[in-house]
Amino acid sequence: DVYKRQRCASICGGWVALKLATNTLKKSGQIKFDPITRHVAAISCGIVNGEQKLDLNYQEDSAAETDANFVMDDKGELIEIQCSAEKKPFSKEEFEIMFSMASEGIKKIVEIQKSALDE
């Protein structure tokens, strides 16, 4: 649903906003070191009509047999996973494909975050 997409976008954009704020605080001398040690990003994925898809839009999410959200850091470590069988159970293999897709998607999002921050 729209909430899930907004949630993933909020995590990605919120992390950038927090990083910009800590950069400003560090430059002004209000903090001595940057407490943020890793990038954090989130992405949705799911199984729609038997096919694994990344970053589901509203129509895909509404039709999904399985729906998942992954939150990871730039080292590929997991922060949160939410995965539900919406219409039918899914296999471990299907989950692993979604996990792999989400990992690759998050790598791309982290690159966009770095670009936005001129890192």
Where are these regions (language model features)?
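A structural signal for small-residue-enriched, beta-sheet-centric alpha/beta enzyme cores
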Residues: 8-9, 18-23, 30-119
